[in-house]
């Protein structure tokens, strides 16, 4: 099945999670890193390609699924985690998925923040969503698509957007590390849908580094910072959560304050 919203669980597939349909078995925490091997990051060729050195000394190119600048992370010679591409016919045979920064593995695959959040929601780790009835992802409403639509047992409906954060200065995480017109548009669309009866939230996920709090990068993207301040003022549920990467596992390390 090609629908990205479908979660595979053994021989069964669900386009949504429904309470009673799905029993968590721990697979999602391991599947991202179970084939990871150590390597050395050499240089970023372009937004999506990096040169890496494998443990046998072979220099190859790897796909980087993150358009952020990440200059503080992608330093020549830093230890990295790579895994074989799922498509053996792809031009780049490897995915660059994490680098070491200050002794912590930092996940570079921005889309995996959604995978982590999907797991945390389904396991009842997120306060306010313990009594979920149904979880959908990549929910399309009109011409827009949102990361999650969650229906609670009470019938309350939520739309959630998830943002991956790996830009950290002295323990303080900032989003974004580069201007994001798309990110701002998502928040503006959520604000509009709130007026149509949806409850809405923006959840930030820090991708491996220990952080004290999460804030908005006014210097890099003042427009995004402004729309987030408006969202908070209008009652949008804005929260941050921390992940720790200890391959092959990903651990939920709780909520962090928004500043």
What do these predicted ranges mean?
Residues 23-24:
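Short, positively charged and aromatic/hydrophobic N-terminal segments
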Residues 29, 207-259:
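Domain-level recognition of nuclease-like catalytic cores that cleave nucleotide substrates
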Residues 39, 146-177, 190:
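Conserved catalytic cores of phosphodiester-cleaving nucleases, focusing on short active-site segments
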Residues 47-51:
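Short aromatic-glycine-enriched beta-strand elements
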Residues 68-81:
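Short nucleic-acid-contacting surface segments enriched for D/E, G, S/T with interspersed K/R
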Residues 71, 102-136:
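Acidic-basic catalytic patches of nuclease active cores, encompassing PD-(D/E)XK
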Residues 78-87, 242:
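Flexible glycine-rich surface loops and low-complexity tracts that mediate binding to linear polymers
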Residues 171-181, 188-220, 242:
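Nucleic-acid nuclease catalytic cores
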